[in-house]
UniProtKB/Swiss-Prot annotation:
It catalyses: N-formimidoyl-L-glutamate + H2O = formamide + L-glutamate. SUPFAM superfamilies: Arginase/deacetylase (SSF52768). The gene is hutG. Its EC number is 3.5.3.8. This is Formimidoylglutamase. Belongs to the arginase family. One of its GO terms (molecular function) is agmatinase activity. Pathway: Amino-acid degradation; L-histidine degradation into L-glutamate; L-glutamate from N-formimidoyl-L-glutamate (hydrolase route): step 1/1. Mn(2+) 2 binds at D156, H158, D247, D249. Pfam families: Arginase. Keywords: Histidine metabolism, Hydrolase, Manganese, Metal-binding. It comes from the Bacteria.
Amino acid sequence: MTMALTQNLWQGRVDDGERGDTTRLFRIVHVLEAADVTPLDGAPVLLGFNCDAGVLRNQGRPGAAHGPDAIRQALANVPAHGLPALYDAGNVSCDDGDLESAQLALAGTVRDVLARGGLPLVLGGGHEVAWGTWQGLRAHLDAQDDGGRVLIINIDAHFDLRTSRPASSGTPFDQIANACAERGQPFDYVCLGVSRLSNTPALFSRADALGVCYVEDVDMQERHLESRLAELAARIDATDHLYLTIDLDALPAAVMPAVSAPAACGVPLTVVEEIAMLARHSGKLRVADLAEYNPQYDRDHQGARVAARLAWRLFG
């Protein structure tokens, strides 16, 4: 496991000859040094998780370890639109197959960003990122002696509730469920975009046994958007803290080809964007992550731009 900063990735177009505000994100990004303890006052902080060890363990296609830097490059040229600051905390890299150590390192960095008042946005990497992200949030809340409820909203074609071990990209929410049970805390998990053709009856049974609230992909289409947003708003109102995780394989393959398991149906990008904005403006979003972007299977950087667009919706 290694840590690396990414300042050289932030390059883009300069339009100083044009009138008005032409600032792009690469011009406002700041490298977040671990030794710096300056309060972040709610500023967004990017953190990469260069790992697809969990995808490999889950018999998927590798390549997501290269996702975070490709998403940064797509973000670099996005107009800032008045965003005062964006921070980059570098990458946690799992370069030796030791997934568990990488997840602990990720958790520590997420905890530290939260302690400074930042909003961590973790860029995966496989969806094994979720176990590290959640542990970081939980560690921060424990340090604050905060026993408030944590709602997890996962936009995903898969439950990721596999009970098999060792842990993989298919197990993070089962791991979280077990951790919540050990702590005597509720497991508040909403999974949106589940594909019945990509999850076995055993996984549906596991979700039912855990009391998971799930909505299948066919019921996440634009015609259902108003109802879905109202339901989510009610759930968010009833919680104290929100963790939003977006597995990019929830999107239709035509929109997001660059994942290990492209979706035949999927959730429309406009629907995912609306949910991201609902979370962002709720005042309860504590941490978010984007998982499974795999540049090896991208077309003309389409997937990177989609991931960057969703990232922007979460902090712009």
